[in-house]
């Protein structure tokens, strides 16, 4: 067999060798992608989250190793673990906790065109340290037998003398209330926010609650006329997520969205010591996307980053106009908010 002069045997051998080498490189790259694993530390605890992580793994070949615990405990754990932490992604509820983790140097900045597109600017950290994934609203629950729901149009109304002996509040340790106060300080100024807090504490009728769910029960049972809670607690009860008895109680109360409404977030960032930051960012992009984010929000009866979603229980609550306050500014104001609450008698 004779070869043309232009394609000598040694050249064919070299081409074949290069082809094998290139093919091996591609296979090695694919194998590496398929063997990737990221550690996710999450303050959330819902089975539907695990289903979303599985969906992400099937789509990308990146495995997710999940650790769930309380938010503050996760922050302290990563601090202790230092450079040896297996965490690549940290998921936390509330802007104040995200800011706390950022201040502790736990996040690394990330740049992502899709996150800039999918996450509104006021719901992400300006340097890309963390990004909002879901929204929740601090709403007013009303017992219509005790209080006319239409008498409440804003958070400021709760400080009016007309509500003396009617108001129930969660205690000062609640990060949700701390962020609400920070929000009002940004919107209305420290002086007005201080007067508002003092007016509300003068109206409190029951000992301060440690959680939102028992507060909703108290309003439904007539122990309070009004109370402040996160929207998803009411939606969860309406959907029967905490039992038939709570579902009946939730149907007794009316929900008022103050105009404008304080919006907080669940968010996530890439951990500074992440072993696989690129894959970690891909997960956050997936969770913030319209498809992934919808499931992440509905798991806890929260709102997606844009719009109001299709959650039946949330639809029953109605719609709201967000106040547009920056979650980053709100988180940074946390210590000042706690001090203002303490000075105003919020126990």
Regions found by a protein language model. Give the residues of each.
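A bilobed periplasmic-binding-protein/Venus flytrap-type ligand-binding module shared by bacterial periplasmic
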Residues: 139-146, 264-276, 295-296
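Periplasmic-binding protein-like
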Residues: 136, 165-173, 197-201, 206-209, 247-272, 286-310
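Short, polar/charged alpha-helical segment
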Residues: 43-63
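Extracytoplasmic ligand-binding site segments that recognize negatively charged/polar headgroups
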Residues: 43, 47-50, 69-73, 85-223, ...
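An extracytoplasmic/periplasmic, membrane-proximal ligand-sensing/linker region
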Residues: 191, 302-347
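Short, low-complexity disordered leader/linker segments with a strong preference
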Residues: 1-37
